[in-house]
Amino acid sequence: HVYDLAAVALGGSGDVVRVAESHGVRAARLHAIKTDVLQALGDHGLTVTAIAARHHVSPRYVQMLFESEDTTFSRFLLLQRLAVARRMLCDPRFADRTVSAIAFEAGFGDLSHFNRDFRRHYGESPSDVRAAIPRRNAS
């Protein structure tokens, strides 16, 4: 992306400038969308349609931006929510919260869906992660 923007700044040929401007704008827009998603992870109404509306683009355009990084909006959202939940489960400051409260705060509305996705991604259940905290801190 830096090379694309540099080509524009240095006055590349017309085709190079058009491609670079387009690529740079797409990268900047994807970055802005990802930042927005990260700030709204706990929002249970966070959808590709809602994000697209906030950025004044179509849902399909948002999906295409994520496809350029070999992922999807839904996958990005899921992985970010799982990461937040795992950090909270491992953090002693959240020891008083239940697994379901942490899942809800991370943006999951369905506990069984959360448990299934968490286990699939991390290879252990949220409860297993929570139970291992004292051992991890003692090591």
Language model region names:
Residues 34-45, 87-94, 123:
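Short, amphipathic alpha-helix enriched in basic
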Residues 66-84, 88-89, 117-136:
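Alpha-helical DNA-contacting segments of helix-turn-helix folds
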Residues 61, 72, 112-113:
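Residues in the helix-turn-helix
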Residues 1-5, 28, 32, 84, ...:
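Amphipathic alpha-helical interaction segments
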Residues 92-132:
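Sequence-specific DNA-binding recognition helix
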Residues 54, 58, 109-110:
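Short coil turns linking two alpha-helices in DNA-binding domains
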Residues 8-35, 39-50, 68-79:
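Short, Lys/Arg-enriched, Trp-marked, Pro/Gly-tolerant hinge/linker segments that flank
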Residues 47-55, 102-103:
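Short alpha-helical "recognition helix" segments of helix-turn-helix
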